[in-house]
Amino acid sequence: LGLGYISAYLQNWFAEAINVRLMVFPEDLDHAVAGDLKPDIVGFGTFTWNRNLTDYYSKKIKDAINPLILYGGQELPIGSDQQTRFMMERPFVDFCVPAEGEIGMRNIVERYLNSSKDIESMKIKAIEGVIFLDSNSDLVSENNEIEPVNLNDLPSPILTGVFDDFFQKGLTPMLQFVRGCPNKCAYCRQGSVESKKIRRYPSKISLEAILYLEKRVENIGKHLSKLAEDHGCKPVGEC
């Protein structure tokens, strides 16, 4: 769901300057590398449950076509020492975007386009909301807790059709009505001060997304959606 929001946001922001393609299945990545797609930037949502698979494909893709590789997700390390260790263990990863990804990803794409797509020249100075290692393997980090995207300005990946192909393949639709978490779990990035700010998506957009799913998902025999909130993921019927 997070990658869907980022995809819709970037495509809306940069319009025809870029072409964003969302992939979920490993075989799609294999086809992209082996075929004619040859992406300039490949981003992964990395979590505990998919870390080994993500590392495997990141290295494979980097060795094959050498695109810009970046990691994002709420389970990236928080402290600078842990972030440095994480990136040094993964030399095939160029950049990481901690916490919410829309603004950091936008800054990476802007820097990439303005640097003639040269990855090393992108690292001459810090990128807001992004971490990376410089030529001396020192961590470069600037304002990781940047002001998050305004949810009123965020296109819905459901209403823009980003997920349509995945519904046809039987994946469970997911919805999100709020971002942020009031809990203070020390092990979780959502326990940070910034993440405690509860922000709601516009009610009109949320309702339109539900109606959109009702029309499309019912026809393929799916009757269950999940609510993916920062404080937990549960079936919509339980909410």
Task: Walk through the language-model features, giving the residues of each.
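Glycine-rich beta-alpha loop elements in corrinoid/cobalamin-binding modules
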Residues: 9, 13, 18-145
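A residue-level signal for beta-strand positions that form part of recognition/binding surfaces
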Residues: 129, 139-140, 151, 172-174
